UniProtKB/Swiss-Prot annotation:
The gene coding this protein: ddl
Entry's cofactor comment: Binds 2 magnesium or manganese ions per subunit.
Compartments reported by the entry: Cytoplasm
Organism superkingdom: Bacteria
Stated family: Belongs to the D-alanine--D-alanine ligase family.
Organism lineage: Bacteria, Pseudomonadati, Pseudomonadota, Gammaproteobacteria, Legionellales
ATP-grasp domain sequence ranges: 145-349
HAMAP family: Dala_Dala_lig
Keyword field: ATP-binding, Cell shape, Cell wall biogenesis/degradation, Cytoplasm, Ligase, Magnesium, Manganese, Metal-binding, Nucleotide-binding, Peptidoglycan synthesis
Protein name (record): D-alanine--D-alanine ligase
Pfam families: Dala_Dala_lig_C, Dala_Dala_lig_N
PROSITE patterns tied to this protein: ATP_GRASP, DALA_DALA_LIGASE_1, DALA_DALA_LIGASE_2
Gene Ontology process terms (BP): cell wall organization; peptidoglycan biosynthetic process; regulation of cell shape
UniProt: Mg(2+) 2 binding residues: 316, 318
Gene Ontology, cellular component aspect: cytosol
Length: 372
């Protein structure tokens, strides 16, 4: 029998998506095949301390904060120099813990923006999902759109503002530019619709700008697209494949954080999408093209708008899509014939394959210094 792989699932973090990260991690831990994997959880509390939970059943039964308080979660630090045992106890014994592959499920700031990926690269650990560069590009929504537009990928138009930019007259200029008073003001580098606000008047615009700047130092303004919200899951490294699309049908004014996670009736999600074959294929191809354009690997969810005249527009790329029991990424693959346990197997395989390919690259270039 093959030796079990040690998988460390990372969750929590210091972003506004902390709680969603925990929900996603619980679903992953519950779904991973215990016959194949030894599973541990690395929980990052709000203030940034790291804890190891090496009994997955306790993680599933209790909140990780509860395990920290009662002492079941061990405080750890990062141990460089031995990639096979990257986690070191802070309890005084200095014990080190194994990881063959890390499954990051830390959404948002410091989880999806390349910071965590950079740490895992320094530890020389295989990890699931996009690398440092791709994570950073996709976290910055204006940068994502700049890259995609340069590559010919259709995107929703946008305008970026920083706190230094004068906002007087901006609303009217954008109204003239897009021909609509209905706009969205959103943080450049947050997800889950945190700090995303619809506006219809200049007063609402000014108020929304002030609110969003409480969360981010840059914001984007976009015209509101009255169309269908379609998503497509992408899986792979060099030769990615796309799932059947899914659709979000919000029951609120828009697909807000509350509609996503707090209101059980906030939206209907479906993988039975009424789209023509040609539009479906177009969405799948654009999703793959966008994935490649930003050099993603492992997984990503590409979010679209489809207008009433079937114009397909990319809204954003999510490199650590949710894995809760209602999340669309695993549901779209399930509908495409890939059950979640097999999906997780493939993601771990892809992470290890990429790491092995990276290890083949020459990292040292030795030359003899010319004598003077």
């Amino acid at each position: 029998m093959a030796e079990k792989l040690h998988i460390s699932v990372l969750c929590g973090g210091q972003s506004t998506e902390h709680e969603i990260s925990i929900q996603s991690a619980k679903n992953i831990v519950n779904t991973l095949d215990a016959a194949k994997y030894l599973i541990s959880v690395i929980f990052i509390v709000h203030v940034g301390r790291w804890y190891l939970i090496d009994q997955p059943e306790m993680f599933l039964a209790h909140s990780p904060d509860h395990l920290v308080k009662e002492g079941s979660a061990r405080p750890i630090t990062i141990a460089f120099g031995d990639a096979a045992k990257p986690w070191q106890s802070l309890n005084g014994d200095g014990r080190r813990y194994s990881a063959d592959c890390v499954f990051p499920m830390v959404h948002g700031t410091q989880g999806e923006d390349g910071a965590l990926q950079g740490l895992l690269e320094l530890l020389n650990l295989p990890y699931v999902g996009a690398n440092v560069q791709s994570s950073a590009v996709c976290m910055e929504k204006d940068l994502t759109k700049t890259v995609l537009r340069a590559g010919g990928i259709p995107v929703v138009d946008w305008h970026t503002l920083s706190p230094r930019d004068a906002t007087e007259g901006v609303y009217q200029r954008l109204l003239d530019r897009w021909g609509t008073s209905e706009l969205f003001v959103k943080a450049v580098s947050l997800g889950s619709s945190v700090a995303t606000l619809p506006v219809k008047t200049e007063t609402e615009f000014t108020k929304a700008v002030k609110e969003v700047f409480r969360y981010d130092d840059r914001l984007m303004v976009e015209p509101r697209i009255r169309g269908r919200e379609i998503e497509c899951a992408v899986l792979g490294n060099g030769a990615p494949k796309a799932s059947l699309p899914g659709e979000i049908i919000p029951h609120h004014d828009y697909y807000s954080y509350d509609a996503k996670y707090l209101d059980p009736n906030g939206a209907t999600t479906t993988t039975s999408v009424d789209l023509s074959e040609s539009v479906t294929k177009q969405i799948q191809q654009i999703a793959i093209d966008a994935f490649k354009m930003v050099h993603c690997s492992g997984m990503a969810r590409v979010d679209f708008f489809v207008t009433p005249n079937n114009k397909v527009l990319v809204n954003e790329i999510n490199t650590i899509p949710g894995f809760t029991n209602i999340s669309m990424y695993p549901k779209m693959w399930e509908a495409s014939g890939l059950p979640c346990p097999n999906l997780l197997d493939q993601l771990i395989e892809l992470a290890i394959d990429r790491h092995q390919e990276q290890q083949k690259l020459i990292r040292r270039y030795e030359v003899k210094a010319r004598s003077l």
